[in-house]
Curated annotation (Swiss-Prot):
Pathway(s) the chain acts in: Amino-acid biosynthesis; L-methionine biosynthesis via de novo pathway; O-acetyl-L-homoserine from L-homoserine: step 1/1
GO MF terms held by the record: homoserine O-acetyltransferase activity
Family, similarity comment: Belongs to the AB hydrolase superfamily. MetX family.
Gene name as annotated: metXA
Keywords, in A-Z order: Acyltransferase, Amino-acid biosynthesis, Cytoplasm, Methionine biosynthesis, Transferase
Substrates-to-products reaction catalysed: L-homoserine + acetyl-CoA = O-acetyl-L-homoserine + CoA
Protein name: Homoserine O-acetyltransferase
Catalytic site: 164, 331, 364
UniProt xrefs under InterPro entries: AB_hydrolase_1, AB_hydrolase_fold, HAT_MetX-like
Residue ranges of every copy of the AB hydrolase-1 domain listed in the record: 58-368
Quaternary structure, from the entry: Homodimer.
Gene3D superfamilies: 1.10.1740.110, alpha/beta hydrolase
Length: 397
């Protein structure tokens, strides 16, 4: 999931935002993760925009994808080169309208963008955790987010919205905390990682661990495994695009030359140069150990096993919310059949579900790109949710 896709800003930005931090678990009252380990303190980095209304019923939790962060919209400083990773969707007058909704986005635990992860200091040693950091799950991420949401004064979310791994978190929220979620918008996602998705992640992890600078995860005082992480990212980028996208964007065009170089170390083709650029850019902002932990959390994700004893129908029997599910025609990482399967399980439980497969040539990353149809659907879906919430609140008076 290439969270920082270039796009032309449209509409009005939320303007300047501030990254904040909240301790969701202390050292003396740790968070026990699903692997059985106790973790504390646990800090989440988060950002908000918009205002929580008096009824506290307009909060939308936006959930980031694999290597994203809390910076979903706006700018830290007026001169920043680019806004948050979903600025095209979040802001005044945009589908997730910050004039109407209170938007929350946090960096997941295990991350490296301000939340507690393997690069954080272990209070027991004063050194970075490295591989002593406990293995985490999507469920652990959501449990930490729940504490943040409650801290912010929200007892019931208007919606949980996310694509890719963010969609996994949205699904987890909907069945783990059904009384806290009015609606959910899982985009380009799945109820369980397929063998194909696991395979790509494993190859990426092996690339990192094969880098001699990885040093068993203990590289924080030395040279990081930049080459291995870059190769891992290159593998990921292949899965985020599609055959059609690659043909249109690159085809077999050469990079800065008119004929083959006949030098193995040189990137002859534009697609080679693109992948190398994306890999090198990634190592400047992401921690290799976090990549290992978060990809493993995605691989472990299996909503059917964790909440339904192997049955998607049984898992969604716990849910109470309305869903808007969207897949993309060229997404071969989480293809449409996986979304159709989850929608069928939802409907077998009598849940209110809207589903659309959107025609898009750009592959898995299409959920991050401008799409008028998707934008309109999300805007209308949230509008209805807010109206329904107001009616429900009025009946409760």
């Amino acid at each position: 999931m290439s969270e920082y896709i270039e796009h032309s800003p449209s509409g009005t930005s939320v303007g300047r935002v501030e990254k904040r931090f909240f301790t969701v678990a202390e050292a003396d009252s740790p968070l026990t993760v699903e692997s059985g380990r106790a973790l504390g303190p646990v800090v989440l980095a988060y950002e908000t925009c918009g205002q929580l209304n008096e009824r506290a019923d307009n909060a939308v939790l936006v959930l980031h994808a694999l290597t994203g962060d809390s910076h979903a919209a706006g700018y830290y400083e007026p001169g920043d080169a680019k806004p948050g990773w979903w600025d095209l969707m979040i802001g005044p007058g945009k589908p997730i309208d910050t004039d109407r909704y209170y938007v929350i986005c946090s960096n997941v635990i295990g991350g490296c963008m301000g939340s507690t992860g393997p690069s954080s200091l272990d209070p027991a040693t004063g050194q970075p955790y490295g591989l002593t950091f406990p293995v985490i799950t999507i469920g652990d991420m959501v449990r930490a987010q729940k504490r943040l949401v409650e801290h912010l004064g929200v007892t019931k979310l208007l919606s949980v919205v996310g694509g890719s791994m963010g969609g996994m978190q949205a699904l987890e929220w909907s069945v783990r905390y059904p009384d806290m979620v009015r609606t959910a918008v899982p985009l380009a996602t799945t109820t369980k990682h397929s063998a194909l998705a696991i395979a790509f992640n494993e190859v990426a992890r092996q690339a990192i661990m094969a880098d001699p600078n990885w040093n068993g995860g203990n590289y924080y005082d030395g040279v990081p495994p930049a080459h291995g992480l870059a190769v891992g990212r290159m593998i990921g980028h292949i899965t985020y695009l599609s055959d059609e996208a690659m043909r249109q964007k690159f085809d077999r065009r050469l990079q800065d030359r008119c004929e083959n170089s006949f030098v193995l170390e040189e990137p002859d083709f534009q697609v080679e140069s693109y992948l190398r650029y994306q890999g090198q850019k990634f190592v400047d902002r992401f921690d290799a150990n976090s990549f290992l932990y978060i990809t493993k959390a995605a691989d472990y994700f299996n909503l059917e096993a964790s909440h339904g004893c192997g049955s998607a129908v049984a898992a969604f029997a716990k849910a109470k919310c309305r869903y808007l599910v969207a897949s993309f025609s060229s997404d071969w990482l989480y293809p449409t059949y996986q979304s159709r399967s989850m929608v069928q399980a939802m409907k077998k439980n009598g849940l209110d579900v809207s589903f659309v497969e959107l025609e898009a040539k750009w592959g898995h990353d299409a959920f991050l790109l401008p799409n008028a149809r998707l934008s309109g659907m999300i805007a209308r879906f949230l509008d209805r949710a807010l109206v329904d919430a107001a009616k429900e609140d009025a009946r409760a008076l």
